Amino acid sequence: MIKYAIIFAVISLIAGALGFSGVAAGAAGIAKVLFGLFLILAVIFIVLAALGVGAAKKMMK
């Protein structure tokens, strides 16, 4: 567990360093695009699961 705490501490330090530099604007734009993309994918998969399409249909049998 301490391993993950150290990993996330390093990631947060890197993110903090980038947040106080000019890289933050570009990273924020990319993050918005990726968030929208994965939000759309999540909605599609939820609808497909509700309709019983694909793997969800096989598991229901």
Curated annotation (Swiss-Prot):
Q: Which UniProt keywords apply?
A: Cell membrane, Membrane, Transmembrane, Transmembrane helix
Does the keyword Cell membrane feature in the UniProt annotation?
Answer: yes
TM region(s), chain numbering: 5-25, 33-53
| InterPro entries (alphabetical) | DUF1328 (IPR009760)
Q: Does the keyword Transmembrane helix apply?
A: yes
Give the main localization category: membrane
Origin: domain of life? Bacteria
The topology of this chain with respect to the membrane is: Multi-pass membrane protein
GO terms for cellular component: plasma membrane
Location comes to: Cell membrane
One Pfam family assigned to this protein is DUF1328
Give the family this protein belongs to, as stated in its UniProt record.
Answer: Belongs to the UPF0391 family.
**Which NCBIfam families does this entry report, sorted A to Z?**
PRK13682.2-6
Name recorded for this polypeptide: UPF0391 membrane protein Pnap_0032
Look up and give the organism this protein is from. Polaromonas naphthalenivorans (strain CJ2)
